[in-house]
């Protein structure tokens, strides 16, 4: 089985060399005072979006990007916060969100994550890049951090993108970091081989919507800073896409027949992208409907 992080590299490698698509530096968006979204500069890839929280007490990072970007990430953290990260919270185990765990551990960070995330990283050489890559503090359902005047509520979202997903609500700032529960304006990657499910993904998105309001700002796993309306739009797309594929499954069509029918054709222009194409989304929904 090819792992998600490797799939990303396989997709881009034949097109251009790594120096052409992988970021060498980070840009930032201040979502709320002291809360930043970091992403690859000049539109290049750094992995998933990263949340950085600065302040006088602690420097906290949520997710941390591809492994080669450790030095560039540390430079960006120090530029905004004045020192390295004290804590890292991982939202799930994929290497585009955990790749610099080891590097940040070597620079003093303590890593937190869900129990199942650690278990997956322990068993996967691609994600377990060294002894410091593994979270040393794990939780089963929820935990709350109190730092820099923030109350950060970290909670498990079961069987969604993976089986070890977490999202983080900053109650005071009205900001939510979603991890890969949100691929804004893109077909989502639902990792059925790592405990994810379409039903759990939909439930997770709905939970985020229910705990937010129109002023909430979301830092997605991939894509720009988003709103509650954006989440609703992407959830409506997923619900409708699943229903379209289910109609054909119920008629007895095979996977290849459904792919040929192209039931998601009118979503292609808005949601198709290199990693999750319209065809791959269709196949994922078929597999989910016939195995869950």
Predicted segments, located by residue:
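Active-site metal-binding motif and surrounding structural segment of the metallo-beta-lactamase
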Residues: 55-60, 68-112
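Bacterial N-terminal signal peptides that target proteins for export
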Residues: 1-6
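Divalent metal-coordination and catalytic microenvironments
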Residues: 34, 53, 63, 77, ...
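Accessory terminal helices/loops
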Residues: 19-20, 210-217, 225-292
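Metallo-beta-lactamase
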Residues: 19, 23-25, 29-30, 57-59, 66-68, 116-163, ...
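Conserved beta-strand hairpin/beta-sheet module of binuclear metal-dependent hydrolase folds
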Residues: 28-76, 168-170, 175-178
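N-terminal signal peptide c-region/cleavage motif recognized by signal peptidases
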Residues: 13-17
């Amino acid at each position: 089985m090819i792992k998600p992080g490797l799939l990303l590299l396989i997709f881009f490698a034949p097109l251009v060399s790594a120096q052409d698509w992988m970021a060498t530096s980070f840009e930032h968006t201040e979502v709320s005072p002291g809360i930043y979204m970091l992403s690859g500069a000049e539109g290049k890839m750094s992995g998933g979006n990263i949340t950085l929280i600065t302040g006088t007490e602690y420097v906290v990072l949520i997710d941390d990007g591809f492994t080669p970007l450790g030095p560039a990430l540390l430079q960006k953290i120090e530029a905004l916060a004045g020192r390295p990260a004290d804590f890292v919270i991982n939202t799930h185990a994929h290497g585009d969100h955990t790749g610099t765990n080891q590097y940040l551990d070597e620079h003093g960070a303590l890593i937190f994550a869900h129990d199942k995330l650690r278990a997956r990283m322990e068993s996967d050489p691609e994600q377990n890049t060294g002894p410091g890559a593994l979270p040393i503090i794990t939780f089963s359902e929820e935990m709350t951090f109190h730092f820099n005047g923030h109350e950060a509520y970290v909670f498990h979202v079961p069987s969604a993108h993976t089986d070890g997903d977490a999202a983080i609500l900053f109650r005071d700032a009205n900001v939510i970091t979603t991890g890969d529960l949100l691929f804004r304006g893109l077909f989502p990657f639902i990792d059925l081989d790592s405990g994810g499910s379409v039903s759990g993904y939909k439930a997770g998105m709905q939970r985020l919507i229910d705990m937010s309001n129109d002023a909430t700002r979301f830092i997605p796993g991939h894509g720009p800073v988003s709103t509650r309306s954006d989440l609703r739009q992407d959830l409506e797309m997923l619900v409708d896409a699943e229903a379209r594929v289910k109609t054909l499954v119920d008629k007895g069509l095979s996977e290849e027949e459904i792919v040929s029918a192209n039931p998601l054709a009118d979503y292609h222009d808005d949601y198709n992208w290199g990693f999750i194409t319209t065809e791959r989304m269709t196949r994922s929904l078929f597999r989910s409907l016939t195995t869950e």
